[in-house]
Amino acid sequence: MIGFGWLEALLRVGRKLFVKPETQLYPEQKPKLYPRARGRIVLTRDPDGQERCVACNLCATVCPVGCIDLAKAVADDGRWYPEYFRVNFARCIFCGFCEDACPTAAIQLTPDYELSEWRRDALVYEKHDLLISGEGKVRGYRYWSVAGKAIPGKDKGEAEHEAPPVNLKGLLP
């Protein structure tokens, strides 16, 4: 017994021949990006032009694939800054956890998603590649004016409404 399924398939293909294709030609037609699209990681500066990053290492800790590497250094005024800051975009999954974990809004994700390179080692970005001249998405935030600096002449426990630190060795028998 011969069915007519082949005729139905032929008619279906014939109808699709005259319909506009849904495929977008990528380099000529860019896809629509949504406002919260996550792309390349950048390091921002505060309004004074200083680096916002305090090298707290929260971004590297929260990263699920471990693509962020940094080392802390201390400036003459006691301010922490990253001696080096390295992001391996070959491993990055652009989850945005690093942006959420950053207490100073220093690390931000931009909508730049075109990161293709011929060599894999070219996808390892150093601090000078990541640092931008502007403030990014968070404008006017000065972390160092509200936190992070030692008060001259006041040690721990000497500020107003602050209890002195507990001596743990004094609690031992």
UniProtKB/Swiss-Prot annotation:
Q: Which reaction does it catalyse?
A: a quinone + NADH + 5 H(+)(in) = a quinol + NAD(+) + 4 H(+)(out)
Q: Name one GO molecular function term.
A: iron ion binding
| One Pfam family it belongs to | Fer4_7
What PROSITE patterns does this protein map onto? 4FE4S_FER_1, 4FE4S_FER_2
Q: Which cofactor does it need?
A: [4Fe-4S] cluster
For the protein in the UniProt heading, the enzyme class is: translocase
| This protein's record includes keyword tRNA-binding | no
GO BP annotations listed = aerobic respiration
* Localization of this protein: Cell inner membrane
Please give, as recorded in its UniProt entry, the membrane topology of this protein. Answer: Peripheral membrane protein
Instruction: Cite the binding residues for [4Fe-4S] cluster 1.
Output: C53, C56, C59, C102
Q: How is the cofactor bound?
A: Binds 2 [4Fe-4S] clusters per subunit.
| Lineage, broadest ranks | Bacteria, Pseudomonadati, Pseudomonadota, Alphaproteobacteria, Hyphomicrobiales
Family stated for the protein in its record: Belongs to the complex I 23 kDa subunit family.
**Where mainly located?**
membrane
Q: Which PANTHER family match?
A: NADH DEHYDROGENASE [UBIQUINONE] IRON-SULFUR PROTEIN 8, MITOCHONDRIAL (PTHR10849:SF20), NADH DEHYDROGENASE UBIQUINONE IRON-SULFUR PROTEIN 8, MITOCHONDRIAL (PTHR10849)
Annotated [4Fe-4S] cluster 2 binding lies at: C63, C92, C95, C98
Q: What does this protein do?
A: NDH-1 shuttles electrons from NADH, via FMN and iron-sulfur (Fe-S) centers, to quinones in the respiratory chain. The immediate electron acceptor for the enzyme in this species is believed to be ubiquinone. Couples the redox reaction to proton translocation (for every two electrons transferred, four hydrogen ions are translocated across the cytoplasmic membrane), and thus conserves the redox energy in a proton gradient.
What are the record keywords, sorted? 4Fe-4S, Cell inner membrane, Cell membrane, Iron, Iron-sulfur, Membrane, Metal-binding, NAD, Quinone, Repeat, Translocase, Ubiquinone
Q: Which gene encodes it?
A: nuoI2
The protein, known as: NADH-quinone oxidoreductase subunit I 2
Q: What is its EC number?
A: 7.1.1.-
